[in-house]
Amino acid sequence: VRLCRNMLDDLWAHSLHETLPSDPPEGGEERYAELRRLFIASLYARKSAELELWPSQREAAKRSTDVSDDLVVALPTSAGKTRIAEIAALMCLAGGRRVLIVTPLRALSAQTERTFRQTFSPLGFSVSSLYGASGLSAGDEDVLRSMDIIIATPEKLDFALRNDASLIDDIGLVVLDEGHLIGPTEREIRYEILVQKLLRRGDAGTRRIVCLSAILPDGQQLEDLTAWIRSDVEGEPVRSSWRPTRQRFGTLVWQGDAARLNYDLEQQGPFLA
């Protein structure tokens, strides 16, 4: 009985019930309580309930509920970055403002759209994405003006804002996905230029930024990135090395029309799967 009680206490302590504050964000006095309830209920109703936060998510999840905290978050692949973005989006939407998610890859945009639609459609929010050719159609402009949650590639968004910078005036949260893809290649430079434009807008102070990444530099480079995203406001990045699964190294050996995968299980020697 004691063990069961301790397990339940631990589960509750790290659940969304405890992590999501009861008090609404600024502007969310009328809607937040109901949206909070629907958000938790939607995740609970999934085939495998998703109410407990993993160790990798806990610090970032708590900070993501503070709409004034610009975040830089580095979590390993499959360690729960999307849930951090969803919590930040919930707080923004409850306050009556829209959400923009920038994803550097088209395939990632489509995947992110599906994930956010699954989470936020039951709450009554619209979700759409913009990717493909850099041109802007009337339909694309309508998406940017009207959808509650927009997922866009840097190229598409940059083109849209050069045509009409007011398209994101009522955006309250910008999520920069795969933040480590800001670098020296042509596509990475485009991403960096877009981020710089967003940070230098006259209304940048009214818009929260959350940067998510699986890989971030150490030392001074990380400090510089955090200071850049936070516009030099003091604050630490969130980092975790915890993963929900174990990693194993292996060798794939191709043999004609079949393959053999050899895992190296530390002292156990090769393993044939």
Model regions and ranges:
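Walker A/P-loop
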Residues: 67-88, 185
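SF2 helicase catalytic motif II
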Residues: 150, 154-158, 164-208
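Conserved helix-turn-beta segment of the N-terminal RecA-like "Helicase ATP-binding" lobe
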Residues: 108-131, 225-233
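Conserved motor-coupling elements within RecA-like helicase/translocase cores
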Residues: 133-151
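Conserved interdomain linker/interface between the two RecA-like ATPase lobes of SF2 helicase motors
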Residues: 196, 208-273
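Helicase-associated low-complexity/disordered flanking segments
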Residues: 1-63, 67-71, 125, 245-248
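Conserved Walker A/P-loop ATP-binding site and its immediately adjacent core
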Residues: 79-84, 91, 97-118, 156-159, ...
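Pre-Walker A (Motif I) flank of P-loop NTPase domains
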Residues: 67-73, 97-99, 147-148, 207-208
